[in-house]
Design a protein with these regions (language model features):
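Extended, low-hydrophobicity, polar/charged segments
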Residues: 1-160
Length: 160
Protein backbone atom coordinates (compact mmCIF):
# COMPACT_ATOMS: atom_id res chain seq x y z
CA UNK A 1 0.00 0.00 0.00
CA UNK A 2 3.00 2.28 -0.02
CA UNK A 3 3.07 5.28 2.27
CA UNK A 4 -0.70 5.45 2.76
CA UNK A 5 -1.68 5.40 6.42
CA UNK A 6 -3.34 2.24 7.63
CA UNK A 7 -6.93 2.45 8.75
CA UNK A 8 -8.32 1.07 11.97
CA UNK A 9 -9.87 -1.77 9.95
CA UNK A 10 -6.45 -2.69 8.51
CA UNK A 11 -4.80 -2.61 11.95
CA UNK A 12 -7.48 -4.92 13.33
CA UNK A 13 -7.01 -7.34 10.42
CA UNK A 14 -3.26 -7.34 11.06
CA UNK A 15 -3.70 -7.93 14.81
CA UNK A 16 -5.98 -10.86 13.95
CA UNK A 17 -3.22 -12.16 11.63
CA UNK A 18 -5.53 -11.95 8.61
CA UNK A 19 -3.72 -11.98 5.28
CA UNK A 20 -5.21 -9.16 3.22
CA UNK A 21 -4.35 -6.91 0.32
CA UNK A 22 -5.36 -3.26 0.06
CA UNK A 23 -6.64 -1.86 -3.22
CA UNK A 24 -6.95 1.85 -3.94
CA UNK A 25 -9.46 3.26 -6.41
CA UNK A 26 -9.83 6.79 -7.79
CA UNK A 27 -12.37 9.08 -6.15
CA UNK A 28 -13.02 12.71 -5.37
CA UNK A 29 -11.93 13.60 -1.84
CA UNK A 30 -14.78 12.89 0.57
CA UNK A 31 -17.22 11.79 -2.14
CA UNK A 32 -18.71 8.32 -1.78
CA UNK A 33 -18.71 6.08 -4.86
CA UNK A 34 -21.32 3.37 -5.41
CA UNK A 35 -20.17 -0.21 -4.95
CA UNK A 36 -20.64 -1.36 -8.54
CA UNK A 37 -18.38 1.49 -9.67
CA UNK A 38 -15.84 0.51 -7.01
CA UNK A 39 -15.87 -3.10 -8.29
CA UNK A 40 -15.23 -1.88 -11.84
CA UNK A 41 -12.48 0.46 -10.62
CA UNK A 42 -10.58 -2.39 -8.98
CA UNK A 43 -11.31 -4.78 -11.87
CA UNK A 44 -13.42 -7.23 -9.86
CA UNK A 45 -16.74 -8.99 -10.26
CA UNK A 46 -19.37 -7.15 -8.17
CA UNK A 47 -20.38 -10.55 -6.72
CA UNK A 48 -17.21 -10.59 -4.60
CA UNK A 49 -17.29 -6.92 -3.56
CA UNK A 50 -19.41 -6.31 -0.46
CA UNK A 51 -20.97 -3.20 1.05
CA UNK A 52 -21.66 -2.49 4.71
CA UNK A 53 -25.14 -1.31 5.67
CA UNK A 54 -26.11 -0.05 9.12
CA UNK A 55 -29.65 -0.39 10.44
CA UNK A 56 -31.57 0.20 13.62
CA UNK A 57 -34.08 -2.30 14.95
CA UNK A 58 -37.39 -1.66 16.66
CA UNK A 59 -35.44 -2.31 19.91
CA UNK A 60 -33.34 0.80 19.04
CA UNK A 61 -30.22 -1.40 18.79
CA UNK A 62 -27.97 -1.00 15.75
CA UNK A 63 -27.21 -3.88 13.39
CA UNK A 64 -24.69 -4.20 10.56
CA UNK A 65 -25.40 -6.14 7.37
CA UNK A 66 -22.80 -6.91 4.71
CA UNK A 67 -24.07 -7.77 1.22
CA UNK A 68 -22.83 -7.84 -2.40
CA UNK A 69 -22.66 -4.32 -3.84
CA UNK A 70 -25.21 -5.04 -6.59
CA UNK A 71 -27.69 -6.67 -4.19
CA UNK A 72 -30.55 -5.23 -2.17
CA UNK A 73 -30.97 -5.94 1.55
CA UNK A 74 -34.17 -7.82 2.38
CA UNK A 75 -35.15 -5.87 5.50
CA UNK A 76 -37.56 -8.57 6.72
CA UNK A 77 -34.96 -11.34 6.37
CA UNK A 78 -32.34 -9.08 7.97
CA UNK A 79 -34.64 -8.41 10.94
CA UNK A 80 -35.31 -12.15 11.36
CA UNK A 81 -31.57 -12.89 11.29
CA UNK A 82 -31.03 -10.69 14.36
CA UNK A 83 -34.25 -11.52 16.21
CA UNK A 84 -35.92 -8.15 15.60
CA UNK A 85 -39.47 -7.41 14.52
CA UNK A 86 -38.12 -4.92 11.98
CA UNK A 87 -34.99 -3.01 10.99
CA UNK A 88 -34.60 0.23 9.03
CA UNK A 89 -31.59 1.86 7.43
CA UNK A 90 -30.09 4.61 9.58
CA UNK A 91 -29.98 8.12 8.17
CA UNK A 92 -26.79 8.90 6.23
CA UNK A 93 -26.08 11.81 8.60
CA UNK A 94 -25.84 9.32 11.50
CA UNK A 95 -23.30 6.94 9.94
CA UNK A 96 -20.22 8.63 11.38
CA UNK A 97 -21.76 9.09 14.83
CA UNK A 98 -22.79 5.42 15.02
CA UNK A 99 -19.83 3.71 13.31
CA UNK A 100 -16.90 6.11 13.30
CA UNK A 101 -16.76 5.76 9.52
CA UNK A 102 -18.07 7.93 6.69
CA UNK A 103 -20.58 6.95 4.00
CA UNK A 104 -18.69 5.07 1.30
CA UNK A 105 -15.89 4.13 3.69
CA UNK A 106 -17.76 2.03 6.25
CA UNK A 107 -15.99 -1.23 7.10
CA UNK A 108 -17.63 -4.08 9.04
CA UNK A 109 -14.35 -4.24 11.00
CA UNK A 110 -13.34 -1.62 13.55
CA UNK A 111 -16.51 0.33 14.19
CA UNK A 112 -16.78 2.48 17.34
CA UNK A 113 -18.71 -0.33 19.02
CA UNK A 114 -19.12 -4.01 18.24
CA UNK A 115 -22.57 -4.29 16.70
CA UNK A 116 -24.28 -7.54 15.76
CA UNK A 117 -23.02 -8.12 12.23
CA UNK A 118 -24.44 -10.45 9.58
CA UNK A 119 -22.95 -11.21 6.16
CA UNK A 120 -25.18 -12.50 3.40
CA UNK A 121 -24.56 -16.24 3.06
CA UNK A 122 -23.46 -15.73 -0.57
CA UNK A 123 -20.08 -14.66 0.83
CA UNK A 124 -19.35 -18.31 1.67
CA UNK A 125 -19.27 -19.25 -2.03
CA UNK A 126 -16.68 -16.59 -2.90
CA UNK A 127 -12.97 -17.51 -3.07
CA UNK A 128 -12.13 -13.97 -1.92
CA UNK A 129 -14.11 -10.99 -0.70
CA UNK A 130 -13.57 -7.25 -0.91
CA UNK A 131 -14.92 -4.82 1.64
CA UNK A 132 -14.26 -1.24 2.61
CA UNK A 133 -10.83 -0.67 4.07
CA UNK A 134 -12.27 1.97 6.38
CA UNK A 135 -12.06 5.02 4.14
CA UNK A 136 -13.32 6.11 0.75
CA UNK A 137 -10.84 5.00 -1.91
CA UNK A 138 -9.62 1.83 -0.19
CA UNK A 139 -10.88 -1.74 -0.37
CA UNK A 140 -9.37 -4.70 1.44
CA UNK A 141 -9.43 -8.22 0.04
CA UNK A 142 -9.16 -11.41 2.06
CA UNK A 143 -10.68 -14.85 2.51
CA UNK A 144 -14.39 -14.65 3.41
CA UNK A 145 -13.96 -16.70 6.59
CA UNK A 146 -11.22 -14.33 7.76
CA UNK A 147 -13.33 -11.21 7.23
CA UNK A 148 -16.34 -12.82 8.94
CA UNK A 149 -14.17 -13.78 11.92
CA UNK A 150 -12.50 -10.34 12.14
CA UNK A 151 -15.95 -8.68 12.07
CA UNK A 152 -17.22 -11.20 14.67
CA UNK A 153 -20.10 -11.84 12.32
CA UNK A 154 -22.51 -14.59 11.37
CA UNK A 155 -24.08 -15.40 8.00
CA UNK A 156 -27.70 -15.64 6.86
CA UNK A 157 -29.76 -15.19 3.70
CA UNK A 158 -30.46 -11.45 3.88
CA UNK A 159 -30.77 -10.38 0.23
CA UNK A 160 -33.59 -10.76 -2.31
Amino acid sequence: MGKEAKTNAMRILERAKVAYTAHEYPHEEGVAVDGVTVAASIGEDPACVYKTLVTQGNSKNYFVFVIPVAAELDLKAAARSVGEKSVAMIHVADINKVTGYVRGGCSPVGMKKQYTTVFDESVLSQPKVYGSGGRIGTQVCCAPADLIKAARATTAKIIF
